[in-house]
């Protein structure tokens, strides 16, 4: 019984500490945005992968990095409208 409580409290701690871990009310759109932003950050952080993208797109590394940062603003487009509950 104590293991279940410990795991639950650890999960709550992680969810409050880190943005991308989600919570019970996380929507599909929020989860997708977190995944895309995580991927773009990883691409920018790995020098060889950034070089690969720059060569494949025939752009400079700075331009590729700028484009990735621009994509991070709204990687999945605007959020879907929620239906109104009456």
From Swiss-Prot:
For this UniProt record, give its keywords in alphabetical order, as a comma-separated list: Acetylation, mRNA processing, mRNA splicing, Nucleus, Phosphoprotein, RNA-binding, Spliceosome
Instruction: Give the span(s) annotated as Interaction with SF3B1 and SF3B3.
Output: 15-76
Q: Which of the residues bear the PTM N6-acetyllysine? A: 17
User: Which residues are reported to carry the modification Phosphoserine?
Assistant: 9
Assembly information from the UniProt record: Component of the 17S U2 SnRNP complex, a ribonucleoprotein complex that contains small nuclear RNA (snRNA) U2 and a number of specific proteins. Part of the SF3B subcomplex of the 17S U2 SnRNP complex. SF3B associates with the splicing subcomplex SF3A and a 12S RNA unit to form the U2 small nuclear ribonucleoproteins complex (U2 snRNP). Within the SF3B subcomplex, interacts directly with SF3B1 (via HEAT domain) and SF3B3. Component of the minor spliceosome, which splices U12-type introns.
The Swiss-Prot or TrEMBL record describes its family as follows: Belongs to the SF3B5 family.
Name of the molecule in the record: Splicing factor 3B subunit 5
> What organism does this protein naturally occur in?
Mus musculus
